């Protein structure tokens, strides 16, 4: 598996390329070339010398040696010459290539000064016994960014620093609702109530996978289930059996269910409703032990909201200024692979969070009535914006010649250690110096944009 390569230090400027092919020679006899196929696209051809191949073959052999049998030898003790004669050294090539390829590919990328932004497509050109191996890699490189105005920008923001009495009351009400308790309700279920149910789903009388649940707590109106399901439980009481009829969306993840009518036999075990505490001094104390009265809580919340509003306003100005700087720039032929990789990163992060909560991808798509494609589309626009923003900010950092000093790197490490409550040494082990330098340069570029911006 080839990991994504990022080389910010030696970005290749295609405008300055006067030739189609560059060939370099390294001290280790590795030959490297790059052929420009199109804007931001090309093919690297590189060789791997026998000095690198032989140790990789040894590692590949040692990896499988313990499982080898041969007459006259104990299991795991087959000599290498016997193995080569019996099976041929070529059977080790694939494992050996996996061992040596990442380092060889990265060396080729670094040698050529390329800034590769997507997974390469690797092909074997030649792989002969006793000779150097030749491989090719189709790569996508970072696009050129032509900067426009990014200093002294004038922006408009739809944000206010003001905090109203209604804002304070709303915050207290949210906390009040958080302290609400679910109590058994004798009457009919209403929107906002929680019902504890068993359900069995079927299509044309046949039950389907994932359509059954026991003692499931469902808040009516939460939108957890497919459209129409929750509405049909409004008015039900404990002990009722309700036949819920719904139609799966045409875009439903499970293709065999998409667009089909389904019936869910649903048993109501309990109906629960929220009981919220009174809005008084006792509630204020329950919300915050540092206050004595409801009025004290309002004063404290007003100060907190004003600080948060100030931050939100500053963030809005920063966001608007960055957005305008990006709009003023021109990105030459943005590779779609960059967007795809950013979308995949976002989707994988989201699904990882879901799985940590015990929700599998299949369960998520079934509960929400969405598909993998829907999720990718959901993140696509944001991914496009994020990629373009990063490219422009990187270009500004480069244009301004921003670099990170040793003291700035150390401060960044300490700040991250404090933020994530981990030892500074652990932060150092997780983040390379290049990553830290890049992040610091990016922050400086953002500061140039925002510190010179003004609000209309």
Swiss-Prot record:
It comes from the Bacteria. InterPro entries: PPIase_dom_sf, PPIase_FKBP_dom, Trig_fac, Trigger_fac_C, Trigger_fac_C_sf, Trigger_fac_ribosome-bd_bac, Trigger_fac_ribosome-bd_sf, Trigger_fact/SurA_dom_sf. GO terms for biological process: 'de novo' cotranslational protein folding; cell division; chaperone-mediated protein folding; protein transport; protein unfolding. It holds the Pfam family FKBP_C. PROSITE patterns: FKBP_PPIASE (PS50059). PANTHER family: TRIGGER FACTOR CHAPERONE AND PEPTIDYL-PROLYL CIS/TRANS ISOMERASE (PTHR30560), TRIGGER FACTOR-LIKE PROTEIN TIG, CHLOROPLASTIC (PTHR30560:SF3). This is Trigger factor. Involved in protein export. Acts as a chaperone by maintaining the newly synthesized protein in an open conformation. Functions as a peptidyl-prolyl cis-trans isomerase. It comes from Streptococcus pyogenes serotype M4 (strain MGAS10750). NCBIfam families: tig (TIGR00115). Belongs to the FKBP-type PPIase family. Tig subfamily. Its main location: cytoplasm. It is an enzyme of class 5 (isomerase). Its EC number is 5.2.1.8. The gene is tig. One of its GO terms (cellular component) is cytoplasm. One of its GO terms (molecular function) is protein folding chaperone. Residues 192-277 form the PPIase FKBP-type domain. It catalyses: [protein]-peptidylproline (omega=180) = [protein]-peptidylproline (omega=0). Consists of 3 domains; the N-terminus binds the ribosome, the middle domain has PPIase activity, while the C-terminus has intrinsic chaperone activity on its own. It is found in: Cytoplasm. Keywords: Cell cycle, Cell division, Chaperone, Cytoplasm, Isomerase, Rotamase.
């Amino acid at each position: 598996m080839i990991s994504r390569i990022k080389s910010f230090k030696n970005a290749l400027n295609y405008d300055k390329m006067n030739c189609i092919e560059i060939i370099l020679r390294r001290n280790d006899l590795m030959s490297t070339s790059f052929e420009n196929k199109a804007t931001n696209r090309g093919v690297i051809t590189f060789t791997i010398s026998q000095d690198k191949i032989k140790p990789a073959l040894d590692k590949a052999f040692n990896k499988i040696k313990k499982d080898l049998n041969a007459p006259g030898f104990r299991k795991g003790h087959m000599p290498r010459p016997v193995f080569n004669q019996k099976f041929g050294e070529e059977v080790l090539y694939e494992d050996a290539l996996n061992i040596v390829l990442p380092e060889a590919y990265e060396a080729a990328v670094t040698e050529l000064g390329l800034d590769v932004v997507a997974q390469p497509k690797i092909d074997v050109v030649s792989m002969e016994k006793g000779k150097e191996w030749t491989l090719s890699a189709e790569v996508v490189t970072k696009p050129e960014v032509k900067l426009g105005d990014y200093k002294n920008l004038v922006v408009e923001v739809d944000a206010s620093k003001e905090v109203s009495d209604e804002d304070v009351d709303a915050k207290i009400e949210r906390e009040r609702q958080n302290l609400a308790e679910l109590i058994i309700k004798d009457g009919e279920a209403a929107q906002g109530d929680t019902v504890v149910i068993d359900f069995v789903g079927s299509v044309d009388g046949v039950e389907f996978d994932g359509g059954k649940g026991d003692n499931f707590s469902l808040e009516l109106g939460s939108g957890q289930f497919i459209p129409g399901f929750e509405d049909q439980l409004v008015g039900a009481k404990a002990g009722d059996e309700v036949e819920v009829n719904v139609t799966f969306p045409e875009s439903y993840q499970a293709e065999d269910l998409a667009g089909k009518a389904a019936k869910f036999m649903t048993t109501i075990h309990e109906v629960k409703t929220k009981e919220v505490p009174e809005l008084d001094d006792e509630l204020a104390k329950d919300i915050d032990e540092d206050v004595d009265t409801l009025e004290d809580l309002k004063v404290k919340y007003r100060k907190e909201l004003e600080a948060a509003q100030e931050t939100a306003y500053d963030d809005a100005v920063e966001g608007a200024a960055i957005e305008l700087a990006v709009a003023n720039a021109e990105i030459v032929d943005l590779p779609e692979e960059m967007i795809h990789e950013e979308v995949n990163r976002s989707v994988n992060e989201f699904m990882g969070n879901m799985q940590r909560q015990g929700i599998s991808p299949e369960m998520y798509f079934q509960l929400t009535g969405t598909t993998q494609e829907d999720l990718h589309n959901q993140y696509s626009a944001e991914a496009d914006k994020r990629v373009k923003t990063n490219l422009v900010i990187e270009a500004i950092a480069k244009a301004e010649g921003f670099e990170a000093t040793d003291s700035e790197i150390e401060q960044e490490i300490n700040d991250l250690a404090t933020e994530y409550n981990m030892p500074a040494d652990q932060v150092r082990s997780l983040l390379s110096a290049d990553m830290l330098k890049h992040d610091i340069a990016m922050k400086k570029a953002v500061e140039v944009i925002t510190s010179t911006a003004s609000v209309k």
